[in-house]
Amino acid sequence: MSTMNTLAFCYGLPNINDITQGIIFVRNNIFYSYLTDYAMEACILNYINIRADKIEDLKKSLVGKTISVRVIRVDVLKGYIDVSIV
């Protein structure tokens, strides 16, 4: 029965290079996207290493907006998803 749950979880993840919609939010100065099609959070790789002053500007312009993102990496075992802005 546990294998059924694991398989069901795997099928709920996006594929690499999929383009989907996400709502942008920030946690601990890291930008994330809530993938509305998959009901999961994904880290946005475009904005991992940026200066603190740029973070504030990006927060003002991006947070709360729905944008298109491309899936870059998926860790099926941990359920982690990394995306980039299209």
From Swiss-Prot:
GO terms of molecular function: peptidase inhibitor activity; protein serine/threonine kinase inhibitor activity; RNA binding
Keywords carried by this UniProt record: Host-virus interaction, Inhibition of host innate immune response by virus, Inhibition of host interferon signaling pathway by virus, Inhibition of host PKR by virus, Interferon antiviral system evasion, RNA-binding, Viral immunoevasion
S1 motif domain residues: 15-86
Entry-linked InterPro entries: K3-like_poxvir, NA-bd_OB-fold
GO biological process, one term: symbiont-mediated suppression of host PKR/eIFalpha signaling
Keyword flag Cell membrane: no
Domain of life of the native organism: Viruses
SUPFAM superfamilies hit by this protein: Nucleic acid-binding proteins
UniProt keyword annotation of RNA-binding present: yes
UniProt similarity note: Belongs to the poxviridae K3 protein family.
Function field: Viral mimic of eIF-2-alpha that acts as a pseudosubstrate for EIF2AK2/PKR kinase. Inhibits therefore eIF-2-alpha phosphorylation by host EIF2AK2/PKR kinase and prevents protein synthesis shutoff.
Assembly: Interacts with host PKR kinase.
Name of the protein in its database record: Protein K3 homolog
Organism name: Swinepox virus (strain Kasza)
